[in-house]
Structure formats: C-alpha cells, structure tokens
Design a protein with these regions (language model features):
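Non-heme Fe(II)/2-oxoglutarate
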Residues: 1-53
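A short beta-strand-loop-beta hairpin characteristic of the jelly-roll/cupin
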Residues: 73, 91-110
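Short beta-strand His + acidic residue motifs that chelate non-heme Fe in jelly-roll/DSBH
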Residues: 74-75, 98-100, 117-118, 122-130
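Short secondary-structure subsegments characteristic of cysteine-rich extracellular domains
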Residues: 108-119
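Acidic/negatively charged segments and metal-coordination signatures
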Residues: 150-152
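A short hydrophobic beta-strand segment most commonly corresponding to one strand
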Residues: 86-91, 114-116, 130-148
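Short, conserved beta-strand element in jelly-roll/cupin
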Residues: 65, 81-98, 139
Length: 152
C-alpha cells in the first residue's frame, strides 16, 4: 500500500521533466516547474529561507495536502534527493490535531512555522483536524551540510 495515499501534492521544483524515466530521482539539478507562475507567493518564502539557513543549493519544493482525517503512514524516504538535501517543513494550513511524528518526537506546528526535519528516519503524519493540512517541503543544501560532507 502507498504510505502517501491520503495525500495529494504539487511539485513546484524538481528534476526537469525531460529527464523523466528510470533515473529521474538520481542526482540532478532541480528546476522550477511552470506552476510557479500561478503561485509566486512561494518564491519569497523559499528565498528568505535559503538566506536564513545559509543555503547554497536549492533542490525540490513540494506542496502537500493531507485530507481531514488522513494519514501518511510510517516510512523512511530513500534515494539521492532524500539523502543530499536538508529538509524544511513549512506548514501553510495546520489546524490543531494535525501532527508530524517521528519515533522520538511529535510536533503540532502552527501555520508559518519552519521546522528542519530528517526524512531519512521513520516518520509519519496524522491529520486529526476537520480541515485539510497543507504544507510546503523545501529541500536545501546548506553551507553547514557542505562543510560536514567535506570533513567525512
């Protein structure tokens, strides 16, 4: 069963669609998708976040909607993109009862918060509210991660 079956998403930025195929999720340079022209409000959020975290490379940008009462089942994200970038969770609409969980932590964020999170460990989401939960995931290679990678 698909762990994300209760969720719908809009990819705003990711690998160029011309690269669609077996290696689509391999190492790539992300590009903006045309949908960005319809939701330009995303841009200042993303670029302000890049500046705030000393971002040096912008990866995927994903907007997700989890229906009221919906769940994203426990899972670990894998692959190049999941391992390469730092992940930032930006709740856009997150009513009381919509929680983001890891084995050792549960958060119930407010709209407008920003949380850095690891998606390469077990995590899940429960929307126990009466409205859709809408969030943006921004993937950024930070200066701190680059320095850490160089020290290995």
């Amino acid at each position: 069963t698909d762990v994300h079956s209760d969720m719908t998403d809009i990819w705003v930025r990711y690998n160029h669609i011309d690269n669609l195929g077996e290696h689509f999720n391999d190492s790539h340079e992300s590009v903006w998708y045309p949908i960005i022209e319809r939701i330009p409000e995303v841009l200042p959020i993303v670029f302000d976040l890049m500046a705030a975290v000393s971002g040096e490379r912008l990866g995927g940008v994903l907007i997700t909607k989890l229906k009221a009462g919906g769940k994203i089942l426990p899972h670990i994200d894998r692959g190049w993109h999941a391992g390469y970038y730092d992940k930032f969770f930006v709740p856009i609409q997150n009513d009381k009862g919509a929680i983001f969980c890891w084995d050792d932590q549960v958060i119930e964020p407010d709209a407008g918060d920003i949380w850095q999170f690891n998606n390469d460990v077990n995590h899940w989401v429960e929307n126990n509210s009466n409205r859709d939960r809408i969030a943006m995931i921004v993937c950024i290679k930070t200066f701190e991660r680059s320095i850490s990678d160089c020290r290995r």
